[in-house]
Amino acid sequence: MVAKKRNTLRSKAAAGRNAKTSVLEDSVLNELPPDPKAFLHQHRESKRDKQNTKQQSFLSQIKNKSLGLDSNLAGISKSAARRRKRKIRDDLKPKMGELLTSLEKEEDLKEYTQDQDDSKDADGDEQMEISINNVTKITKSNKYGKLSHELPGSVKIKKNQPSIRNQKGAKQLAIDESKRFNQVLTNQSFQQNPFGSLREIIKMQK
């Protein structure tokens, strides 16, 4: 005699109940509105991450500067970049020709104003005319007479001079320049006619 299966009906009933509950749960989830707090806890950058990004950007900038990488020099060869940098350095140097032209313009303007004053004060005091002529008179200085044997345009290169590129040389050059500046200020020819003295020195150096 075969035994009867007593759990078949129970299993069928349990399966039906489970199916109904799953359908109900799905329907409830679909009917619920979206959670308003779902996007409140987004990922935020911490202070350590910000510090790391700043440090990396700073290190990359230093690396680019040390390698000579510039956005304006991107895509050109190293020799062309060196030529451009050399040209920029040369443009920053003082141009003695421009100073000479400015001094000549100053002298022309002074002579023009003098001519006008002389025409207006032709019947004036003669002592005033003598003082004006003495102011505009160019007196040659004998201080730089030793440079007369050199050809114009020749530059005398002094060896074993302190270099401006290191700290010790720059300090020594500053001391020498201050001494030379004081000597120039105390020079009698420079005190009598400063523009004329500057013009003579520039013409000697050209």
Curated annotation (Swiss-Prot):
InterPro entries: Slx9-like. One of its GO terms (molecular function) is G-quadruplex DNA binding. It comes from the Eukaryota. One of its GO terms (biological process) is ribosomal small subunit export from nucleus. It is found in: Nucleus, Nucleolus. Residues 1-58, 105-125 are annotated as: Disordered. Residues 42-52, 105-122 have a biased composition (Basic and acidic residues). Keywords: Nucleus, Ribosome biogenesis, rRNA processing. One of its GO terms (cellular component) is nucleolus. Belongs to the SLX9 family. Interacts with the 35S, 23S and 20S pre-rRNAs and with the U3 snoRNA. Involved in ribosome biogenesis. Required for normal pre-rRNA processing in internal transcribed spacer 1 (ITS1). May be involved in the movements of the replication forks. This is Ribosome biogenesis protein SLX9.
